[in-house]
């Protein structure tokens, strides 16, 4: 029997009403329960204000590192940028550093940013600098990329003060943050000012054409992040219609023709994530360009499954996979 349609207290449609439909048998069994109480919020101009009101999760207690905020100058003509820093060993020197960009579809801030960066710092024993970049649609491309590059430049220039090794700088993020990280790696390659040793792309948002000029397979994008949300997020970020000919060159990682010379990459996604196909394609293109690349596709995982159901076996395997990749990258320099 199908689950009855239920309304979330905030008025969102619950994904639990979709269980037992045509593609639900593809969801990992341990991930199904988490969908029952998950609000389905389709991103649009009408829902964006409500989405930005969602409360953030509180920081984790000790032994996870405390968090500190710091403001740095933005690019010329741009406002200062807030950085959120997680330091597992204050006062230490010569450490690797991970520059993190949060998810949120380019239009909002991830509500789980605090525990995410605390866990990375603690589990990977690196300084984590998360960039509170400007959001779309208020700021369109290249505003957020300028913020992220300014943060990369600041970390590199202040390595001694931060106690980090400027030869061990990695970039990464989840979802839209993964898209930002890919774009940042491309800019760093093109400008040849700052060496980046690794890009950690966790179910990255890489291609504006998904859901606009290119339809995803029916089994992908049924949960959490769908084609309509993707069109809205990309259009807001780009300042033009997603998938159109007006998209600026270099603004979409998947549209960049030359991927050679980029740092090694780890790309991970769930098999039924809307981004699965574009992530697999990007990984294959990196490999073809001679970029050392590890691709991990986890059966039955929808978008953000590791955050929504962190105790599931597949989620633990996913997290262990990218954490191990980041530690290996830091150890090889």
Segments the model singles out, each with a brief description of its role:
Residues 1-85, 243, 330-333:
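A glycine/proline-hinged amphipathic helix-loop "lid/cap" segment
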Residues 94-103:
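Short beta-strand element of the alpha/beta-hydrolase
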Residues 111-130:
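Short amphipathic alpha-helix adjacent to the substrate-entry channel of hydrolases
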Residues 139-160, 322:
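Alpha/beta-hydrolase active-site loop
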Residues 156-171, 191:
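Gly/Ser-rich "nucleophile elbow"/oxyanion-hole loop immediately N-terminal to the catalytic nucleophile
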Residues 186-244:
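Hydrolase active-site cap/lid region
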Residues 267-269:
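Short beta-strand/loop motif that positions the catalytic acidic residue
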Residues 312-333:
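Catalytic active-site module of serine/aspartate enzymes centered on a nucleophile-bearing elbow/loop
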């Amino acid at each position: 029997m199908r689950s009855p349609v239920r309304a979330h207290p905030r008025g969102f449609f619950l994904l639990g009403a979709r269980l037992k439909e045509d593609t639900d048998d593809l969801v990992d069994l341990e991930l199904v329960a988490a969908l029952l109480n998950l609000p389905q919020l389709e991103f649009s101009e009408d829902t964006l204000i409500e989405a930005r009101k969602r409360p953030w999760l509180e920081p984790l207690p000790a032994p996870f590192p405390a968090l500190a905020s710091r403001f740095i100058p933005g690019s010329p003509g741009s406002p200062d940028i807030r950085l959120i820093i997680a330091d597992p060993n204050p006062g230490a020197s010569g450490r690797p550093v991970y520059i993190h960009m949060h998810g949120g579809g380019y239009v909002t801030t991830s509500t789980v940013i605090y525990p995410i960066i605390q866990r990375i710092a603690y589990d990977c024993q690196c300084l984590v600098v998360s960039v509170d970049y400007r959001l779309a649609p208020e700021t369109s491309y290249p505003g957020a990329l300028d913020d992220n590059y300014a943060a990369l430049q600041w970390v590199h220039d202040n390595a001694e003060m931060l106690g980090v090794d400027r030869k061990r700088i990695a970039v990464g993020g989840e979802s839209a943050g993964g898209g930002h990280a890919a774009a940042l790696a491309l800019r760093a390659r093109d400008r040849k000012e700052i060496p980046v040793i690794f890009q950690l792309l966790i179910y990255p948002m890489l291609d504006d054409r998904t859901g606009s000029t290119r339809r995803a397979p029916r089994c992908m994008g049924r949960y959490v992040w769908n084609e309509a949300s993707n069109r809205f997020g990309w259009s807001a970020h780009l300042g033009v219609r997603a998938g159109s000919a007006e998209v600026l060159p270099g603004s979409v990682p998947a549209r960049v023709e030359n991927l050679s010379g980029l740092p090694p990459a780890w790309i991970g996604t769930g098999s039924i994530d809307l981004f699965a196909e574009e992530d697999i394609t990007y990984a294959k293109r990196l490999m073809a360009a001679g970029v050392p690349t590890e691709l991990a596709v986890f059966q039955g995982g929808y978008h953000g499954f590791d955050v929504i159901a962190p105790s599931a076996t597949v989620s633990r395997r996913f997290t262990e996979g990218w954490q191990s990749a980041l530690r290996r990258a830091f150890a090889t320099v």
